[in-house]
Amino acid sequence: MTIKDIARESGYAVGTVSRVINNNPNVSDAARARIMEVIERYNF
């Protein structure tokens, strides 16, 4: 599982996934929640 896979599964761009992983505050709560859901599902 890579960042690209997380992005594809969540429907967000690789950059957005990277910002969530790095705790950047410039990500909407909805996007963060969806991406974290995918990350947790795949134990990334």
What name fits each language-model region?
Residues 1-44:
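N-terminal helix-turn-helix DNA-binding module of bacterial transcription factors
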